[in-house]
Design a protein with these regions (language model features):
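Structural signal for short hydrophobic segments within the conserved structured cores
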Residues: 14-17, 99, 138, 147-148
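Short aromatic/hydrophobic "clamp" motif used to bind/position activated sugar donors
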Residues: 42-43
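RNase III-family endoribonuclease catalytic core
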Residues: 56, 160-178
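Active-site-adjacent loop/tail segments of enzyme domains
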Residues: 18-21, 47-56
Length: 178
């Protein structure tokens, strides 16, 4: 931790904040650390998503003036969804209004602190915590490359994005359906 603090000092970064046992505790620790110089907005990102694109950040930042407390990147859900337990399918879920939620999530600092303050429930992310308090959440376009590392095999999916990309070329073409 000392070495990380030294690096942060050298590059004039905020010093690292010790996380908690849960996401809620870790985010709250970070929010508390920022209290002295409270920003208007914060971006909360989980380290399980190592790829954040400039476009997603631009989408979030451009939305600041739209008077939402929280803005999140989303992707449409392409796969079929089912509810299953005990090795049986029990329900077909309509995917038409379902989306994949990503991070970073842009939140109003004061509202997020207020939501975290006396909260004992566990929420998957900041948008679900704020929604539980009756706050409407805005969405912007996410990026499919912002994969979440949950299982060991997920690292293999990320390899093309994290290794030398010189073997990849950009090809632009036109096409049409007949």
């Amino acid at each position: 931790l000392r070495k990380i603090k030294d690096i942060a000092h050298k590059y004039k970064l905020l010093e690292p904040i010790i996380g908690g046992d849960t996401r809620h505790e870790s985010v709250y620790n970070a929010l508390t650390f920022l209290k002295k110089d409270a920003p208007e907005f914060v971006l909360v990102h989980d380290s399980a998503r190592p790829i954040v694109t400039k476009k997603v950040l631009e989408n979030l930042i451009e939305s600041i003036n739209l008077n939402y407390t929280c803005v999140i990147p989303i992707l449409p859900l392409n796969d079929s969804i089912r509810s299953a337990y005990n090795n049986e399918i029990h329900e077909v879920v309509n995917r038409q209004d379902k989306v994949i939620v990503q991070t970073p999530q842009l939140c109003n600092y004061k509202e997020l602190v207020k939501a975290h303050k006396n909260n004992i429930e566990i929420y998957e992310d900041e948008s679900s915590l704020l929604m539980s308090k009756g706050i409407k959440i805005m969405t912007v376009e996410g990026d499919p490359r912002s994969l979440k590392i949950t299982y060991e095999n997920d690292f293999k999916l990320l390899e093309p994005y994290l290794t030398n990309n010189s073997k990849y070329i950009t090809v632009i073409g036109n096409g049409f359906d007949i």
